[in-house]
Amino acid sequence: MVVANQKTGRSHAVSGYFDSMSRRKRARGQVPQQKQLSGKTVAVLSDGVDSGLDNAFNHLESALGPVQGGAGGLARLDAMVTTELGDVIDALAEEGAVLLNTSEHPDCPTDEAAYRAVRAPKPLYDHWVDYRGWQHRVGIDAKAQNGPTTSIPLALAARAVNVVLAAAPASIALFANSPLEGGMPTGLKENRLSIWPRMFAAAKFPCDARLSQTPGRRFSDLADYFRRAYGVGTVMHTVPLASSRDYKGASHTARPEGDPSLMRFLAESAWPGIACDSGESVMLAPSAMHFEYLQFMPFLDARFRFRFGSLPPVPELLEALHGRRNLETLMAEYGAEGYIEGRCPGANFPDAGLLAEAGADVAATVVMSASAVQAGLLANLEEAEKLVADWGWQRLLALRQPAVAAALDDAAVHAFAGEVLAVARAGLDAGDRHWLGYADWVWQNKRTGADRMLETWHSLGGDRDQRLAGLAAQQTVLHPSQWATAAVI
């Protein structure tokens, strides 16, 4: 979520936000806990909600759920979302800040000084920047996604990843909402997704860029998926010295010496490493915990995410990764539960302009619409696979960049998005189909958030600061209590 100063529209790094959020949680009878890294509060943990940061103090992230799926599941999630969003907006108001309806701040500095001033104190970022050579600062302007997560049986996981990857052009186009950067139009409707080639342009390891790109063929199974992420030609990231599942928050980590792939690392009983905080030599004991911990490595448009109930022995895990036994079966034996993380939809929220133009019914579905699309596709998996086959994997890969650049103005992207929505609608329970409302409205009118933002930007006069302030005033996210009643700006 993109945070801005309420008066100027400039990017805003939160200060008292976490204390404000804690008070709101306590007022509802919850017992929130604040999470700290390097002496700074970075999240508030409460019942079913992690109210934290993405990569910086100007870029908020709230992780919610899980909720029971099936009929009514989207409404159950929406109830949590609207409560959390109301809390976020109220907490920000206490420090003179607002959320902007955009998937990237329209005019935020990304130089090294600005980056260091607001970056979250997550140790992994030091490894990315100082050792792997990533240009992590290109995302410090709050490039924000609305990432739907949908549980999936392990036996269907690879098929589900394939479908969500293939549907990327539709998801990108329908939720495009970042046409500006540095106070200027970029020529892209979803400039947010320019992040990966820029971040990895000077990376030390070629695999980092490769793992952000959709492969040229479908994954055959989960072992195939993980071999691409963890196998020959890849380099594992730092790992915790103690047991941890929090890849951005683990505070004591080590870098394995020699830059091995994870599969090479797991094949040994011990591996030398270097402690990231002290520089001391350590010995690491390879474990299935490392397999679970490093699941973030593919920065794809969709990822399979999971959690073991108990950790399998490494020899059994390696057998499955090498295809000598079924990985899905092994993971099930050790109590793993999995879900698909969609990473294409840009952040979209109701603002006064959308409410006036599309109406309250559409505005009320904006936040949930991406989840509805993904849930519908995965509930209608066979038809979704037929759609992908009809269009062709390579053709859909080629549609991704036109979706980033032109969104629904591209005729083929528009046609594909319409077919995706039809398959998703058929997969949803009749009572849940209205959650597609925003996506349907965008498709029917070819009016993405990016299109509306560009119109606003071109209509504004004044200097750069005045234009930003005017844009921010019109892009301010409405409090859920206003979604049916806000006055037109």
Give the label of every model feature segment.
Residues 284-287, 292-299, 303-314, 330-383:
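Long, repeat-rich segments with strong aromatic
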Residues 93, 104-335:
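Loop-rich catalytic cores of soluble enzymes, especially ATP-dependent carboxylate-amine ligases
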Residues 1-144, 155, 159-162, 176, ...:
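Terminal catalytic/cofactor-binding subdomain
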Residues 61, 145-149, 341:
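Short aromatic/hydrophobic contact patches that present stacked aromatics
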Residues 7, 14, 19-20, 249, ...:
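Intrinsically disordered, low-complexity regions enriched in small/polar residues
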